[in-house]
Amino acid sequence: MKRSLLVVTAVLLAGLWASRAGLRAQDNPKADDYKISDADVARVNPVKSSPEGLAEARKVFGYDCEMCHGAKGDGKGEVVESMKLTMRDWRDPATLAKLSDGEIFYIITKGKGKMMAEGDRVPEKLRWNLVNLVRALAAKGGGEQKSAAATPAP
């Protein structure tokens, strides 16, 4: 009896979370109408890439980003097909060549299309470390990067 009640409670909570997440994702700008201000584009990453920062970002990536972006950042996450997503391969430097750190930070913070915003859940420094991690994925096909903070905006 207790187990049944626990299972029902877990299912209800998961449904509530999923519906809330769906509403938040729907509020995000569609990929086609996405416009980032010049000030946000020009933002420079104030957080120097470090093994500790990348490890912390990797944890968040693992439970928040990996399901869509894939464990290696290749865009082959487990929900891509079922959600009908078109994902980019972050390991390819050409994918990120035209994006500044400020743009990546903005997308992580505000979300985009079906991607949920992390701004209200993840501290700013950790979001900048996620930018460093995304740059590191492209730097060595999923490896580490020397310093994303020094990467100039295009």
Q: What positions do the PLM features span?
A:
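C-terminal capping alpha-helices of c-type cytochrome domains
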Residues: Y106-G113, G119-A148
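Electron-transfer interface patches adjacent to heme c in soluble/periplasmic c-type cytochromes
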Residues: L85-G102, A117-R127
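Detector for the c-type heme attachment site
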Residues: H69-G75, A94, T109, G119, ...
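Short cysteine/histidine-rich zinc-coordinating motifs and their immediately flanking basic loops
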Residues: E78-S82
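C-terminal segment of classical bacterial N-terminal signal peptides
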Residues: A14-G22
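Sequence/structural segment immediately N-terminal to covalent heme-attachment motifs in c-type
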Residues: P51-D74, I104-K110
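Bacterial N-terminal signal peptides that target proteins for export
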Residues: M1-T9, S19
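Electrostatic cytochrome c docking/interface patches
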Residues: N28-V60, T151-P154
